[in-house]
Amino acid sequence: MMYIVFIMSVLYVVGFIGFSSKPSPVYGGMSLVVSGGLGCGIIMGSGGSFLGLVVFLVYLGGMMVVFGYTIAMATEEYPETWGSNVVVLGAFLVGLLMEVFMIMWLFSGEHELVGFYFGGLEDLMVLGEEGFEYVREDYSGGASLYSYGFWFLAMAGWMLFVSIFIAIEVTRKRY
Amino acid sequence: MNPLALSLILTTLLAGTLITMMSSHWLTAWMGLEMNMLTMIPILMKTTNPRSTEAATKYFMTQAMASMMLMMALTINLMYSGQWSITKMTNPVASNMALMALMTKLGSAPFHFWVPEVTQGVELTPGMILLTWQKLAPLSLLYQMATYTNTNLIYLSGLLSILIGGWGGLNQTQLRKILAYSSISHMGWMLIILPFNPTLTLLNLTIYIMLTLSIFMILTNTFTTSMSSLTLMWNKTPAMTIMLMTTLLSLGGLPPLSGFMPKWLMIHELTKNNSIIMPLTMAIMALLNMYFYMRLIYYSSLTILPSTNNMKMTWRFTNTKHTMTLPTLITLSNMLLPLTPMISMLE
């Protein structure tokens, strides 16, 4: 199971490289969707099935849809893709090369592997450490946001509201 | 700006800093820093020219990058220690990365490049908020977590800040850039004393905020933003010209004014800890700051440049700007030195 999470993490970074090399937002949006799906897979593979589905629903199903529609309204006639411009292709290949080097370094020496332990029992006991716990952490985390973490929720809602205000204030007509 | 929107944005700016200063959990501290950053953007973009839009964009980019680094430091700390407390970041990777992120937020070298450009691109009032209020939240976090960081990094950054703040301000004629480099230099002084005696960091912050607020308010009242407008200030408000002189001397750290108090106590504390070369270098480099403040004083108060005769007899219109807190601030920023024994109040 940890192999699957590891491969998904690598592909997640490759997806990030895909839009960081700055093609047109049409292709960047596609890369974001791929990365978002893989990120959801990482969360689910590490035991948080509820929060992974929340990522799919809210991030991909809400925000990326709106992003996709706005790009479709503002797109140009010949959008720049990874193969059309040598700068974008070069940036993508450099990022890919860096990722390959990092994986080679990760498996090279005798140092401790940070964050990944191949050979654990993650398939059978999904909560990470040895002992079987009676409380699912992701469900109870989501629930405690509404009970103990009420002020976190209030602040998060307040900041979403203020962010809309700021976005409208910044994009008002400026003469 | 619409008064309702402005009040919402200023409330959230205050709330962000207060949340960071009151928190013991790293996530709420990070949340307060993000609130600060986001609500600073429309304040910086209050005027409608492309220059302030560019300044707001630069501010957003650097602060977002610093927030990202801080988040990575927090998660590394969580991975190695399993807890979110601010005062116990024992992993060196996490604490040094968080240190660098907070130094970027403060604008100390070598992460200082955004400060002069952002301060110059905006009006005087947003620049004032940028250089005074936005220092409170990152410094309150640094005050709590600095014991576990690599102190060599703090000394290096502080010394570099004093050098760059001194040398960078020498060639400037625009007052906002001069005040930005002065801010970088004062951040350097505040950082160096942090491992030795954090109370003096808070003292320096308090006195620096009072001084910077006084100077910005004097400049806002007389509509001066460059050195050439400074030369005409003697005719409009002679009293404020003299006050600008004394406040600038205080900012440079000249006794018997209150700006001398933090510098004196810091050099005292450093020499008590057997470090001689560093306070010597700091004191000498503070003279660079003093040189360009003296240049401002020379052109505003000590000389009257040649001008036509009718410019020497301008009609005095009534001042439409508020000067409500200015007399108090000027008095505090010039005459606080005899109250030095009261710093035990800050402990």
Curated annotation (Swiss-Prot), chain B:
InterPro entries xrefs: Complex_I_Subunit_2 (IPR050175), NADH_DH_su2_C (IPR010933), NADH_UbQ_OxRdtase_chain2 (IPR003917), ND/Mrp_TM (IPR001750)
Reaction(s) the record says it catalyses: a ubiquinone + NADH + 5 H(+)(in) = a ubiquinol + NAD(+) + 4 H(+)(out)
GO (cellular component) term, any one: mitochondrial inner membrane
Gene Ontology BP term (one): reactive oxygen species metabolic process
TM helices/strands, residue ranges: 3-23, 59-79, 93-115, 150-170, 178-198, 199-219, 242-262, 274-294, 326-346
Subcellular location: Mitochondrion inner membrane
Membrane topology reported for the UniProt record: Multi-pass membrane protein
Catalytic activity, EC: 7.1.1.2
UniProt entry keywords in alphabetical sequence: Electron transport, Membrane, Mitochondrion, Mitochondrion inner membrane, NAD, Respiratory chain, Translocase, Transmembrane, Transmembrane helix, Transport, Ubiquinone
GO molecular function: NADH dehydrogenase (ubiquinone) activity
SUBUNIT field: Core subunit of respiratory chain NADH dehydrogenase (Complex I) which is composed of 45 different subunits. Interacts with TMEM242.
Family affiliation: Belongs to the complex I subunit 2 family.
Function: Core subunit of the mitochondrial membrane respiratory chain NADH dehydrogenase (Complex I) which catalyzes electron transfer from NADH through the respiratory chain, using ubiquinone as an electron acceptor. Essential for the catalytic activity and assembly of complex I.
Protein name (database record): NADH-ubiquinone oxidoreductase chain 2
Organism for this UniProt entry: Loxodonta africana (African elephant)
